[in-house]
Amino acid sequence: TNFSVGGDAKIPIGNALNLDLTFNPDFSQVEVDDQVVNLTRFAISLPEKRQFFTQNDDLFKDFGANNDVTPFFSRRIGVAEDLDGNTIENKIVAGARLSGKLNSNLRLGFLNVLTDADIANEIPSNLNTVFTLRQKVFNRSNISFFLIDRRTTEDFDFISEEEKKNSVTGIEYNLASADSKWNGRAFFHKSFTEGLDDDDMISGMKIERKTLSLNVGMEVI
């Protein structure tokens, strides 16, 4: 009989910050995903339903412009591919998340999750980290900075140098006019991977004008 112990804790820090901790989490009670038939060549991004990842998740999931520019997607944590290329569960050992407000205009997000190694399927143990700050500007707009990092916890012999660690950092400006007629986003992201120096930057801009009778938009990536 396999016996395992796990637990979760929520620790308030001041009036506006919360520290969430999890050890050996059990997500068996999470709502099952809706069945989706994908007839395109693009991957489907199913919504995150695991409670540990959902609180203040807008701090972590809104980077980029569309499904083609998504530097962080929490559903990737806890899944991996076996030797046959099939998607399998990759056990989460522990995680910590600090999120909330530093003041009325500045929000903080920090996420740190350790996944277990599966030597039989040549899956390494990874430490996944996200750090973000979001500063409100003007009436409804904001500027965000983020750093995303994934690295193996030891030198597994089945992992190449390029796969051992990867980091992405970026800055984004999100426009939302006071009258809700103008919305937009401008971003710049840079990736850092050992041994890879090409195609490691991306930038883009999107702006929309919305009224009751008009909806005009432009996007450049």
Label each residue range with its predicted role.
Residues 1-221:
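Outer-membrane beta-barrel channel domains
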